[in-house]
Amino acid sequence: MTYKKPDKKIKNKSNWYLPPLKRRDFLRGSAGGMAGAWLSTWPWQKLSAQQNLNPVTEDWDSGIVRHLLPAVNETQILIKTSFTRALREAPRLRIQNGGSTRLVEGYLNDTSGEFWQFYAIDLQPDTEYELSLQDSRGNALCERWPLSTFPSPQQNPEKVRVLFYTCAGGPEGEYFGIGDRRGNLPIAIRQRLLRRGLSFTPQAAVANGDHIYWDLHTWQGDRAGELSPAGQLSNFDFAARVMGGSNEDAMKLAAGPQIAPLYGTAFRSTPVYFLQDDHDHWENDSPLTYPVPWFQLQLARTTQQ
């Protein structure tokens, strides 16, 4: 089956978007990280290529799912995902346990239909569910997978194992040996580190900040406060909103290569929680960087949704 990418953005339909209050109630301050922008000719080409870096290869059919990141508590599931092509109609999350089945319609997370999230409530604590993603016609978008809710506060598990890590972001770099690299570690090496952590079968993972490295200003020397080379080459309209137009395209272009190929679908059965740090607000923190400029604050907030 062939697919032609639509020329127009999806029109804003308020019921397609998850209300901010629900996100805050669910995550209670923790959130996922995504950000970035750089729209000159060279970054467009290089970052577009990185966008398609092969995610973690495994014996599971990801279909058209580019990346999938779940979070849970004892009665709720929140799944954020992106697809290799835009979906013009809302996909659905199918949740099964024993003889019980329910369908949860996706909330649109961008304006083009590539990014969606699914929010399910009133689930049972400490219960494994079988999940699957479907298009609006019921066709499978990927293979099924298991995901468990957390125990209730009244339960007393004998043990828990949590994976903690930090500073996993950054565009693709080169590694030649110990102490010899250019830029960030290659995605393949970061994937191996995460897979090693997942091999210990943690019940959850916490990514402690710096998911995106794309500082827009420099804060050293005579040029303190001026746009960095990345900032000069970016195409941001700092007076405009983040979502829609070139600002959204720029954010996706820089964020995609730092998130989607790194995680792929490897964490589909491991709830992961993203905390934000300085670089997730588009700066390397300094006394001069506060308060965070309005536009960069909107970037940070947008990447949490």
Identify the residue ranges that each predicted region occupies.
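N-terminal secretory signal peptides
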Residues: 1-22, 48
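N-terminal, polar/Ser/Thr-rich
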Residues: 26, 52-53
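Divalent metal-dependent phosphoesterase catalytic cores across multiple superfamilies
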Residues: 53-305
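Short, cationic motifs built from Arg/Lys/His that form the positively charged side of catalytic pockets
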Residues: 23-24, 82
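N-terminal export signals
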Residues: 14-19, 25-46, 126
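Acidic, low-complexity intrinsically disordered regions
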Residues: 12, 34, 38-40, 56, ...
